[in-house]
């Protein structure tokens, strides 16, 4: 019975990877920048991979959207989000498409500490970059949503108060993820590489639970967390419980929340990347409204949509 369970999990894991690979394939299918200029590989830290690309339509001082891609442990880079970042830049905001893939391999704590360097960099270089950090939004998908959420809780230490956070198909609750998903080979490897915990050899004792809880952004959300846009699928094949955990944490602190839930059975993880679909197009319309409202004075309302 035990072997059969792992065999079935392995087959499902392969299917999940294939679905995600298809969506990644179409993420940049419509790569038209239409007046958006791109300055590539601007360094924000000393490590080799600590760079970002800057997308903008105008040279004047602009609000800024700082985005972290997903799939870093699977080898994906910021290049996989070029079309998405260019589209956001068309709204009249500067977009930083941040690379952090190398930092992920250091482990969770070290990765987050290294990613914090972007905060110090933005505080120091905002004038040079032509961005308004008083109108800053963090965003990300998958593990990038985890990084974006974490930085939103640390930004005030650098004199930055984000006006919004945008999260897609994200990862937020480490302890819940480890308990519920380590049977999947890809998720077991993620936990092993990122948290340096081998759950097939180590017991889930108090020290492991305490550590994972301390690394969960759901436990870091306070009343001062920025207004949040969160998008996910009810049929997410990779992280089915994660968005619900983050939404619960946000609601408990009375943070303004725009929640978008895809309910169609054939709409899966990171569906926003495939711009051919109506669900992705609808989400992008609402995201445009959220960004404009956030940078024009702040989001002070709650929204819920099933799409």
Model-based region annotation:
Residues 1-307:
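Alpha/beta-hydrolase superfamily serine-hydrolase fold, recognizing
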